[in-house]
Amino acid sequence: MHGVSQQSLARFATRAQKLAGVSGDVAVLITGSREIQQLNRRFRGKNKPTDVLSFPREEGGDIAICADIAHANADRFGHPAASEMKVLILHGMLHLAGYDHETDNGRMEEKEALLRARLNLPASLIQRTQNLASKVAGAKTGLPASHRRAKSIAATNKKKTKKRTRA
């Protein structure tokens, strides 16, 4: 697996499962771009490869990780491929635990940051996506990153206030 120890990933998956609070059996599949694209198309209706997919069951579940994307991201972000795969395993475990970063108002992001620090892992998927979006927004607005973050936080707080007043 391109210099990544299966035993090391298996030990990490067991530890991440406990820390994420996932009971039952969890299987982790390390696969290639073509296979993960087929899974993504079949189960999510998206005909493109992705880095990680999670399939929860009543207890436990399955996680599929694309080794090709993991290696490319590791190169891109300057850390070992094993670290990238661990980030993906942790992300998948949190989905199996019921977290959903698309709908949970930052709960998954907070939990992932806490566990990443505890496990000494690099930036999370959520964090990288937000950093990239922030850079793109900054390029469009010309604002420095610190101002964009402050503006984003202010906008988020404004939305929360509006939601409370509607109820």
Predicted feature residues:
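An acidic/histidine-cluster motif and surrounding catalytic segment
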Residues: 1-85, 94-167
